[in-house]
């Protein structure tokens, strides 16, 4: 929260994205990244603190600083955290949510579960962005059509293909 306040006060950001999507074992084995939403109280405290800090610092600076949250489906197929994390983030004032439609254990393997993006889109009142398996413009259009999501977050699909955003 202190870092978010500093960024807002120094006019170095127009939004803050809390990324709980990292599946890398050196991060998740310590409870960070994609594993953090499993720690519901800590997840709640972090999101609440950053939203509050951005609201307060933004008010002093005379501008709105939205906080967005990125999550994964969960740790694995038996430990789904997306529903609770998404509803919690919305309740705490997150401006939007991005779902990487894989579990932590999947890392980047297999197909992304776009149906989970559609499910969260139906569940939430805030904008939902989809992430996973978007490597070209046709993939982005397919995700928008299949899920009804409000936008696309491109990750690995832009590596070596920066023109994807132009397409």
Stretches with model-predicted labels:
Residues 1-167:
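Flavin-dependent oxidoreductase catalytic cores
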């Amino acid at each position: 929260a202190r870092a978010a306040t500093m960024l807002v006060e120094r006019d170095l950001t127009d939004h803050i994205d809390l990324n709980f999507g990292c599946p890398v074992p050196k991060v998740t084995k310590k409870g960070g990244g994609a594993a953090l939403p499993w720690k519901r109280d800590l997840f709640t405290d972090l999101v609440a603190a950053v939203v509050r800090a951005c609201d307060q610092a933004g008010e002093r600076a005379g501008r709105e600083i939205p906080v967005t949250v990125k999550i994964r489906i969960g740790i694995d197929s038996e430990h789904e955290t997306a529903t609770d994390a998404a509803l919690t983030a919305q309740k705490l004032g997150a401006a939007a949510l991005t779902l990487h439609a894989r579990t932590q254990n999947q890392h980047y393997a297999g197909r992304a579960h776009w149906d989970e993006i559609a499910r969260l889109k139906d569940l939430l009142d805030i904008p939902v962005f989809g992430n996973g398996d978007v490597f070209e413009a046709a993939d982005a259009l397919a995700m928008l059509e299949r899920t009804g999501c409000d936008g696309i977050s491109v990750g690995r699909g832009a590596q070596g293909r920066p023109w994807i955003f132009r397409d």
